[in-house]
Amino acid sequence: MAPQSTKFALITGCGAGGIGEALILEYLRRGIHPIATLLPFESSEHLDKAGITWFKLDVTNEESVVQLKKDVSELTKGRLDFLVNNAGICYTMTAIDTDVKSVQRMFDVNLFGPMRMVHHFHDMLIASSGIIVNIGSIGGVVPFVYGSSYNASKAALAHWGNSLRVELAPLGVRVLVIISGEVGTNILKNDHGRTLPEGSYYSPMAEEFKNHVHRTPDAATDRFVYAKNVVGESLKKSPTTWFWTGSYSGVIRFLHTFFPKTVFDRWFSSLFNLAKLKEAHDAAMKKKVA
């Protein structure tokens, strides 16, 4: 049985190689008792080696969340100091070629998952005057090409967190939104096989799209450095509301704060070579007219 003075951190999405694993180890290093969650099919070897407490969880399944609460409550005697909503998935596709069912699945993980977690665990957080940490992204702020749906899920998470922060303040619970820049993880692995649909207006960009879904982010922040920053902020008595950390987060924060939103348009158009698409489209239109 853990002593009454023990603090507990519950982190979702702690598969090997991701941000969750790094967060778990950092909370452990800081003297917090971390509790990890894994998808039912994920290996626990990396957590077992570190002596981490873990439970299976599918954040899209109500019964799974309810069972997790029972298990965690039994372990912590009804207390929870940190709830870190980290579980997330990507969906990379052009906005007009989006498969809505795939996006609904992503929203179920990235947005409705945290909502389920807060709905079921809020009483334990209130009992401990705890903190909710929502892992967001610069994608929720900037028009990242081929990421419109993912961007939307992270924008929704951030702004849901804004209202959550105000509503929970009288109950003694803090809410911290992390605006994550590029971090070196394996989150893109499930997108490696994704291709543009046949007949897409973006077919001239097929090779660029393929390279994008197979990319290794340049100058990405090491996930353990990122975890150190995030955990450090969550341990503060009065953390900031939006905490920007990770590669490119500083410059994006500056531009987002002081410039019109269209400041990003030319940047991302150039970064993704959309001039090539325009040239191909213009040529195709001329051929139709001829």
UniProtKB/Swiss-Prot annotation:
Active-site positions on this chain: Y150 (proton donor), K154 (lowers pka of active site tyr)
Binding site for NADP(+): I11, T37, D58, N86, Y150, K154, V183, T185
Assigned EC number: 1.1.1.-
Oxidoreductase found in the keyword field: yes
Record localization: Membrane
Gene Ontology cellular component list: endoplasmic reticulum; lipid droplet; membrane
UniProt KW keywords: Glycoprotein, Membrane, NADP, Oxidoreductase, Transmembrane, Transmembrane helix
Topology relative to the membrane: Single-pass membrane protein
CDD domains, per database record: 17beta-HSD-like_SDR_c
Primary enzyme class: oxidoreductase
Membrane-spanning ranges: 125-145
This protein's record includes keyword tRNA-binding: no
Role summary: Short-chain dehydrogenase; part of the gene cluster that mediates the biosynthesis of sordarial, a salicylic aldehyde structurally related to the phytotoxin pyriculol. The most interesting aspect of this pathway is formation of an aromatic product from the highly reducing polyketide synthase srdA. SrdA synthesizes a reduced polyketide chain from one molecule of acetyl-CoA and five molecules of malonyl-CoA. The polyketide chain is then reductively released as an aldehyde.
Protein name according to UniProt: Short-chain dehydrogenase srdE
